[in-house]
Swiss-Prot record:
Entry's localization field: Secreted
Protein name (Swiss-Prot/TrEMBL): Toxin ICK-21
Glycan attachment positions: 71
Domain comment, as recorded: The presence of a 'disulfide through disulfide knot' structurally defines this protein as a knottin.
Keyword Plastid: no
GO MF terms held by the record: ion channel regulator activity; toxin activity
Amino acid sequence: MMKYFLVLCLVVLAVAAVQAAGLEEEKFLNLGESLAMPEESRCKARRYGCTDKAECCSEKCAYPALTCVFNWSCEKVCA
């Protein structure tokens, strides 16, 4: 019984580690989810990255908090 408890603890720790690593990944593109959304929702939902300069510079997507690939700000890229 103790063996199962230890395995369960290891699984929980592994899941927590993967989720913590996933927080860093959110800063970059998550194309699987974002491409499934309508364009306007995709722009609003993706606060940390954009697929290309055209999308970053579009009126819908050019929020000050939004950063483009390589962490360029939209203002810097679109200027």
